[in-house]
From Swiss-Prot:
InterPro entries: 2-oxoA_DH_lipoyl-BS (IPR003016), Biotin_lipoyl (IPR000089), GCV_H (IPR002930), GCV_H/Fam206 (IPR033753), GCV_H_sub (IPR017453), Single_hybrid_motif (IPR011053). This is Glycine cleavage system H protein. The keyword Hydrolase does not apply. It comes from Synechococcus sp. (strain JA-2-3B'a(2-13)) (Cyanobacteria bacterium Yellowstone B-Prime). Keywords: Lipoyl. The keyword Chaperone does not apply. It comes from the Bacteria. Its cofactor is (R)-lipoate. Transmembrane segments: none annotated. Binds 1 lipoyl cofactor covalently. NCBIfam families: gcvH, PRK01202.1.
């Protein structure tokens, strides 16, 4: 089964995606990351109001295979946390680009988005790995 990378999203090489809605970025992990992790058993996310910095860890995802840090693709303030994936981590695999989003961030520096890639570029990155 081919993994999907929706074209309306932006991606980073640490396997997070960004969906921009005005000055808010919805951040989650890609289908590739979910596939590589396997069965997800824990998701640790920051609280609302937390300031995150581009390139820094903002949480973690634990699976039966590994514990992986989540890296902020941009800087800003966390304005919403998806408590549903914290309470039911396995649900992240069901819809990573929809109900499986992780956090929403008020974008501090729109220039941060210049370092993201298209779905096509991200697909080339992961398919070449």
């Amino acid at each position: 089964m081919a993994l999907e990378y929706p074209s309306h999203l932006r991606y980073v090489d640490t396997h997070e995606y960004i969906h921009v809605e005005d000055d808010i970025a919805v951040i989650g992990i890609t289908a590739y990351a979910v596939d590589q992790l396997g069965d997800i058993v824990f998701v640790g996310l920051p609280e609302e109001g937390t300031e995150i910095e581009k390139g820094e860890s903002f949480g973690s995802v634990e699976s039966v295979k590994a514990v992986e840090d989540l890296y902020a693709p941009l800087s800003g303030e966390v304005v919403a946390v998806n408590t549903a994936v914290v309470e039911s981590p396995e649900s992240l695999a069901d819809d990573p680009y929809g109900d499986g989003w992780l956090i929403k961030v008020r974008i501090a520096n729109p220039e941060d988005l210049e370092d993201t890639m298209s779905a096509e570029a991200y697909a080339s990155l992961v398919e070449g790995s």
